[in-house]
């Protein structure tokens, strides 16, 4: 039933997006939405600091006229996913309800990281260090689920003030991925089953919601496409079929992909902007995608995509 509802809703939103005029005046600070021009600026900033991300044109027949032909969307490929979400340690104390009034019980950050510095000291200045984001494609940021999973549940403000924007120096050399993907025939039993998967991730501009939108498609260790049920194993179960739905990519041919629905993105970003402003700082729109990739990690906590970890509020 949920799949049928999502399909009908998706078709309705396609029509609504087609009829929605292109946003031309910036409303980033007021509402958290962005114009296509601001999406381009944020995308250029992401590509500059995280070279594993690149602009792409997609299919010529699906080009959106409000974006340059060669900058229709962003993509990063062969992103490692070493384990399934159910393999992560989890308890109710780690949940944080991000939004409660969306009709689906809120956006739950199942693997919320706590124990970080508060907003009083942190929301004073935005700094960006670029040396650890990967000047080559050999460096991919690692999900820091090993050390930060302990602590009490936090509310929306705690999530925005610290959990989204914490410092993290961890990186991994992707040259190890090839070695990890070799069959381990000598182990025997369940240990011989290779867990590593890879994902292609895409960020598009959603004209209806006027925010970025994340798409992902997964492959097994032999680079064979994963079934939808298999991809759901790498998504927080609180978000499957709710925050995450299966839809056609707006710029690429089938098969359909998993997509993180953008209906809450602007609201979350607006609250982050307000938090920064309350601390005397100012969040530039060019930082949008870096922060966006940070907060959607709650949905796909085991997919280790690249984004700048070295920015503090």
From Swiss-Prot:
Disulfide bonds: none annotated. GO terms for molecular function: Atg12 transferase activity; Atg8-family conjugating enzyme activity; Atg8-family ligase activity. It is found in: Cytoplasm. There is a cross-link at residue 242 (Glycyl lysine isopeptide (Lys-Gly) (interchain with G-Cter in ATG12)). Its EC number is 2.3.2.-. InterPro entries: Atg3/Atg10 (IPR007135). It holds the Pfam family Autophagy_act_C. Coiled coil: none annotated. Homdimer. Interacts with ATG7; this interaction forms an E1-E2 complex that is essential for the transfer of GABARAP thioester from ATG7 to ATG3 and disrupts interaction with the E3 enzyme complex. Interacts with ATG12; this interaction is ATG7-dependent, essential for phosphatidylethanolamine (PE)-conjugated ATG8-like proteins formation and also mediates the autoconjugation of ATG12 on ATG3. Interacts with the E3 enzyme complex composed of 4 sets of ATG12-ATG5 and ATG16L1 (400 kDa); this interaction disrupts interaction with ATG7 and promotes ATG8-like proteins lipidation. This is Ubiquitin-like-conjugating enzyme ATG3. It comes from Xenopus laevis (African clawed frog).
């Amino acid at each position: 039933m949920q799949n049928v509802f999502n399909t009908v809703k998706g078709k309705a939103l396609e029509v609504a997006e087609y009829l929605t005029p292109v946003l031309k005046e910036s409303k980033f600070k007021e509402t958290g939405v962005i114009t296509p021009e601001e999406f381009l600026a944020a995308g250029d900033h992401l590509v500059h600091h995280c070279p594993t991300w690149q602009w792409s044109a997609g299919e010529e027949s699906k080009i959106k006229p409000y974006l340059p032909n060669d900058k229709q969307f962003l993509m990063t490929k062969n992103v490692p996913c070493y384990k399934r979400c159910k393999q992560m340690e989890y308890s109710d104390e780690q949940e944080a309800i991000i939004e409660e009034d969306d009709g689906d019980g809120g956006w739950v950050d199942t693997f919320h990281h706590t124990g970080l510095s508060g907003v009083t000291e942190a929301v004073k200045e935005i700094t960006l260090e670029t040396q650890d984001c990967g000047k080559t494609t050999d460096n991919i940021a690692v999900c820091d689920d090993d050390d930060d999973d302990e602590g009490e549940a936090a509310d929306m403000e705690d999530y925005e003030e610290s959990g989204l924007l914490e410092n993290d120096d961890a990186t991994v050399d992707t040259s190890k991925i090839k070695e990890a993907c070799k069959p381990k025939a000598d182990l025997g039993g369940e240990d011989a089953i290779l867990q590593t998967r890879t994902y292609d991730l895409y960020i598009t501009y959603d004209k209806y919601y006027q925010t970025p939108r994340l798409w992902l498609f997964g492959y097994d260790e032999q680079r064979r496409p994963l079934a939808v049920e298999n991809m759901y194993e790498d998504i927080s179960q609180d978000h499957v079929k709710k925050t995450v739905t299966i839809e056609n990519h707006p710029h690429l041919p089938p098969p359909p992909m998993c997509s993180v629905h953008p209906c809450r993105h602007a609201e979350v970003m607006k609250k982050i902007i307000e938090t920064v402003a309350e601390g005397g700082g100012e969040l530039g729109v060019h930082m949008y995608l870096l922060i966006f990739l940070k907060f959607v990690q709650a949905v796909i906590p085991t997919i280790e995509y690249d984004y700048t970890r070295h920015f503090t509020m």
